């Protein structure tokens, strides 16, 4: 019901619903003061009349606010149970192509638009883990590194992986249906998941390049996936540009930094991100490797890509 270009209530759509803009409250933008803590919260916490500031609307919005980008020639990947990949734009990108590719336009900070696509993520692995002997992430990754590369590939966003009774069986069935050997060992499953996610990321980066008004020269990874070194290297290899990691706690950082901006600690989003970059002591950069091998793998991925 909001016009993405004017950022105001869309009178035409409201009229179709028999409503008027006056029926709704004033929209609050990120970085604006909403008020102060209620008297009840003040009493319970002893904090007093602390100002309450609007942040970037929800977890992903706050996480993207904390992406340590240096310029607009970057894409971001919020990597966790789900993956959200996109770019930050000054204007919404609304076209037949963006509709066809199923990208959304979501409000960001300082009037920006988050043009993004939802992708599957660690959901695949999380649903497999209960079916295996108890293993930590380090053990899972070590087992994957020992296995043959690109033995089995899947479309992580295929409908059959949305909520199957058994994720391992769903992966096996997909592989059989596409003429591939099904994973048998834990390491083969993990490698299949990581390589397939990385190749799906390449597919989405190529979609973004069709929509983006500027070149995409690097990908920033934030969220829990920023700590997954194997997946990040696979991603750099697949997309052919450097992958740079931000914080695994980007949602909390973005939330706090918008409050800091309201308080005058920083004046702009560029200052905010410069402060975040200077504070990161665990950021890593992954350069693309084995480009020809991964180009061949991408062709195989496309050949077995099915919606199922």
PLM region spans:
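Active-site core segments that coordinate phosphate-bearing ligands/cofactors
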Residues: 3-11, 15-16, 39-218, 227-251, ...
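Short beta-strand to alpha-helix junction loop
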Residues: 5-6, 30-34
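A conserved helix-loop-beta module that forms one wall/lid of the active-site cleft
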Residues: 14-31
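Small/polar loops that bind or transfer phosphate-bearing groups
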Residues: 29, 223, 247
